[in-house]
């Protein structure tokens, strides 16, 4: 950018914005201050503002209608569409490798498995899981009239379900997307949950924070996609409450990364938690970046997670009866 003073100035401005937003969005803008030496290593594309540049194309292609400027909650799903396009070339490379009998490694799995779910499918799934569960416990609710894809259960379908799921308050609903991608399922679940909280009389300024704290969980093997999911949910919350950032509530989005232990570390873990689990159990997530949400945690780990002191902040809610896998 040495020959483009204006582009250099905008690059410095971009770096400054990254530093500023780190406080509110640490999962999106990592600690990139000068003391970390990170933001100065950020590669700025040449000709940032030139004809045909990435920024210029983005401004021209992303119209106000695409971004949902007239919608109070915006159109955060555009983030997922952009990311799908961003990784499409890499995905094609991996797929071509499959045709040549090449196996996908940990680095190829995220690109190969990214599939953006169409909006109508998202609405159908969420309305007939989260929405139906709420309606079963609150049959007088009129919210279902707003759900275009909701299917009223027949008498046979609803018989006996009242005792299985008895959701008294919105906080009792826990929604987990074990392969959340850029968060399309969770962002629509946010909208539906907001309607539920609103109908129950909660203060509008409190609802976004309550949803992110109590209701929504996501897991993803693609670190970039996980960051985008957290960003999309945060923007959803911010669109509903202008003072949301002051609450300092972060989305419950977990990047699934491999965790492996050596034999001596296994012994230390058993001593620490006063259990006697073998190495295979402790290394359940050694290839988490390959298998992701396909991994079924052994019952011993589930019980340990639910009983450990750390579970007081809500880890154990991932295993209770009101958990909904989408």
Task: Locate each region found by the language model.
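Non-catalytic, mostly N-terminal accessory regions of nucleic-acid modification and defense proteins
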Residues: 1-137, 234-258
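SAM-dependent methyltransferase catalytic region
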Residues: 100-324
């Amino acid at each position: 950018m040495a020959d483009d003073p204006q582009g250099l100035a905008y690059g410095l401005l971009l770096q400054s914005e990254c530093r500023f937003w780190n406080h509110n969005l640490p999962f999106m803008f990592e600690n990139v201050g000068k003391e970390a030496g990170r933001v100065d290593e950020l590669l700025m594309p040449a000709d940032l503002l030139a004809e045909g540049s990435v920024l210029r194309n983005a401004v021209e292609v992303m119209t106000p209608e695409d971004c949902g400027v007239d919608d109070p909650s915006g159109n955060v799903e555009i983030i997922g569409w952009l990311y799908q396009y961003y990784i499409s070339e890499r995905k094609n490379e991996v797929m071509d490798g499959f045709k040549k009998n090449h196996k996908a490694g940990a680095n190829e799995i995220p690109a190969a498995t990214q599939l953006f779910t169409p909006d109508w499918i998202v609405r159908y799934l969420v309305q007939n899981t989260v929405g139906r569960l709420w309606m079963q416990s609150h049959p007088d609710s009129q919210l279902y009239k707003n759900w275009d894809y909701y299917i009223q259960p027949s008498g046979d379908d609803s018989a006996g379900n009242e005792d299985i799921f008895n959701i008294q308050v919105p906080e009792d609903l826990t929604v987990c997307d074990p392969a959340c991608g850029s968060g399309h399922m969770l962002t629509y679940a946010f909208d539906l949950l907001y309607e539920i909280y609103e109908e129950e009389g909660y203060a509008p300024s409190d609802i976004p924070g309550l949803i992110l704290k109590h209701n929504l969980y996501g897991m993803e093997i693609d670190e970039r996609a996980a960051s985008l999911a957290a960003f999309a949910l945060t923007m959803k919350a911010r669109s509903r409450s202008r003072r949301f950032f002051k609450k300092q509530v972060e989305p419950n989005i977990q990047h699934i990364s491999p965790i492996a232990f050596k034999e001596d570390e296994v012994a230390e873990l058993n001593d620490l938690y006063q259990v006697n689990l073998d190495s295979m159990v402790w290394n359940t997530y050694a290839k988490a970046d390959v298998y992701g949400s396909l991994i079924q945690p052994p019952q011993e780990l589930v019980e340990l997670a639910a009983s450990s002191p750390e579970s007081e902040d809500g880890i154990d809610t991932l295993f209770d009866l009101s958990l909904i896998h989408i």
